[in-house]
């Protein structure tokens, strides 16, 4: 079974990964079939967890900036009321892509909109 060896990260030693699990830490001998990833100077961490997200709000990022919470909600609730099922779907795809690209592997979405009242 091949392993992924993370070498040179800002951790004192190598990290071996097999089947998505860390199997060894420290000085690791590279075996035939292993892949080695040069992580020189990088920080290696487990996947990040976002426990509170509103993915649909990606569609209105940049709107009503500089407002307090109440004014922000007053401005955006009418906008969110017009979102379609497709809008929410696209926002979720983009939002999940951004989370994945920044190291998030688990997210909990707090979705309370019902597009079209369905």
Where in the sequence are the language-model features?
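Histidine-rich, glycine-flanked metal-binding segment
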Residues: 2-4, 10-46
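Conserved, mostly hydrophobic/aromatic
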Residues: 41, 52, 103
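Active-site gating loops and adjacent loop-to-helix segments of metal-dependent hydrolytic enzymes
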Residues: 59-90
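Redox-cofactor binding/interface segments in oxidoreductases and associated redox assembly factors
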Residues: 38, 50, 109
């Amino acid at each position: 079974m091949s392993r992924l060896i993370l070498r040179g990260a800002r951790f004192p030693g190598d990290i071996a990964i097999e089947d998505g699990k860390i199997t060894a830490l420290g000085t690791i001998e590279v075996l035939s079939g292993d892949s080695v990833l040069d992580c020189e100077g990088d920080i290696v961490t487990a996947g990040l967890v976002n426990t509170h997200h509103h993915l649909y709000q990606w569609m209105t990022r940049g709107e009503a900036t500089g407002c307090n919470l109440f004014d922000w909600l007053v401005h955006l609730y009418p906008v969110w009321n017009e979102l379609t099922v497709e809008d929410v779907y696209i926002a979720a795809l983009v939002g999940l892509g951004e989370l994945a690209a920044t190291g998030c592997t688990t997210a909990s979405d707090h979705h309370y909109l019902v597009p079209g009242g369905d």
